[in-house]
Design a protein with these regions (language model features):
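Glycine-rich, acidic/polar active-site loops that bind/position phosphate-bearing ligands
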Residues: 1-212
Length: 212
């Protein structure tokens, strides 16, 4: 059974009050690697932190059968962040959740639980697992096609390129979310870019990659 640090819960409640947070997105990753979630209002936050929020797990692909549908999303207070691209009035925050069964046990199909279980096994063998991914992606002119925004190549430096400005903004947004960035640069293909994240423990990085 997972336990939450009471001080961490109080910190989240304080931060939500001080920053005019109205909505909290409860995120989790399904077994296929897709980001899922739902939003609650700040009035439900304390109850969610202490007991989780119920949802129909049978509607999530790869989770459970319809006759076993009750699951609970238990937010991890250590993942609380205010989303910087949302308005500051009635602000929006997010937390990643552990998925629990009605009897309070971790759900076996929860990706986060699978990772934590294997990290615990590694820890018992004396290993600590750190991850430092290089996130590569493309900028396109719009979401309906694949027309590149630039025709640069590896490590090109063009301060006036719109893609460079977009990459800069991406780095600043990640840092606003408390995600440390080591470096960023243009990659080999036109409009291909890379942001290198500073290494950290695997569970934190898994949440970070889903945020990214």
């Amino acid at each position: 059974m997972l336990t939450r640090d009471p001080d961490a819960i109080e910190f989240v409640l304080h931060e939500a009050r001080e920053n005019d947070v109205k909505f909290i997105r409860l995120w989790f990753t399904d077994i296929l690697g897709n980001l899922k979630g739902f939003a609650i209002t700040v009035e439900e936050l304390e109850g969610a932190l202490r007991g989780g929020m119920g949802f129909d797990g049978s509607s999530i692909e790869g989770f459970i059968r319809s006759d076993e549908r009750d699951l609970y999303a238990l937010p991890d207070p250590n993942t609380f962040n205010i989303l910087p691209w949302r308005p500051r009035t009635n602000a929006v925050a997010r937390m990643f959740c552990d998925i629990m069964t009605p009897d309070g046990e971790p759900f076996g199909g929860d990706s986060r639980a699978v990772l934590r279980r294997n990290l615990d096994r590694a820890s018992k063998l004396g290993y600590t697992y750190y991850v430092g991914p290089e996130m590569e992606y493309f900028y396109f002119e719009d979401s309906s096609g694949t027309k590149p925004l630039d025709h640069g190549s590896y490590f090109d430096q063009d301060a006036t390129d719109i893609s460079t400005d977009l990459r800069r903004q991406s780095v600043l947004t990640l840092e606003d979310l408390g995600i440390p960035v080591e470096a960023s640069h243009h990659e080999v293909a036109p409009s291909q870019h890379e942001i290198d994240l500073r290494h950290t423990d695997a569970l934190t990085m898994a949440d970070t990659v889903m945020t990214y």
